[in-house]
Amino acid sequence: MKFEIASILNRCTTELSLNKDINLAINNLLQIVNEYIYERTFYTMNRKLLFFDIDGTLLAGGIPGYIPDSTIEALKQAQANGHYIFINSGRTYGFMPEAIKEFPFDGYVCGCGTEVIFLGKTLYHYDLDEDLKHSLQSILEECKIQAVYEGRKSCYFQKTEKPFAPITAIRNSYAKTNLEQPIRFFDDPVLDFDKFVILTDENSSLDLFHERTKEHFDFIAREEMHPYGFEEVVPKGCSKAGGIDYIVEHLGESLASCYVFGDSTNDLSMLTHVKNSIAMGNSYPEVLANTSYVTTPIERDGIRNALKHFGLI
């Protein structure tokens, strides 16, 4: 907006300096301003809110992944057409890949709705109770479950002699993509996290863990990481759908103006919440069965094809 206003002022200044006929100059200035008002009104009336998952939706190639050129071009065109584009991810902001942070998204719904950011300003953040955060480690140990705490600035890992293979992969990925933030551990005196993921094996007591923590958390069963079970643990009341609602209310929009894009089971809350729901061609079967449109896989220009299908670019 600041750039647009500066551009208008520059055009007006140029017009005044070049045109000696003051009446003609004023008429030209009014035309410039009217064109601007019409353009912004058109964009505002036709603006849509686009929400994208990250892994498997915007990022291809596994971990750490990359954003295909066709996707970058499509996102830029969507913004140029006046649409707002948002990340809506299970990842907290501290675990966002650099490829995502480098792109000028208009906002973020992070950590399954635990934080909502718009134009660089945090609109909402769920603060976990301090005593609850520090009580979790003993419950996890009792239930023989391994976990990663995910925060806005850092992720926290257990100190264990035999970490599950996916935990090691997550730790290595975090180390590669978050060079400015050191790896932290559960015994850190300050635990600043919003949600966490858990992994289980045949020795884990998942039912007991659910029973001990269900008062405070919801559980999202994710795809199996054979031979491990994998769940996201999110504060009650937080979800990707709830993050969308917060943005919609803040902007005075409606769910009818929203389009959501995902591929995984943790996207189901938003995919079933919004009419215009798009599954990537590489999505899991449960996701494919719960969306209004299926596009091609991310590596085959899935985002660009979907945006074209809906007339967004």
Q: What does each model-found stretch correspond to?
A:
Residues 67-165:
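Active-site phosphate-binding/coordination module
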Residues 273, 281-313:
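Asp-based, Mg2+/Mn2+-dependent phosphohydrolase catalytic module
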Residues 33-44:
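Short, Lys/Arg-enriched N-terminal segments with co-localized hydrophobic residues
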Residues 145, 150-261, 265, 270-273, ...:
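Conserved acidic, metal-coordinating active-site core of Asp-based
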Residues 48-61:
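Asp-based phosphoryl-transfer active-site loop
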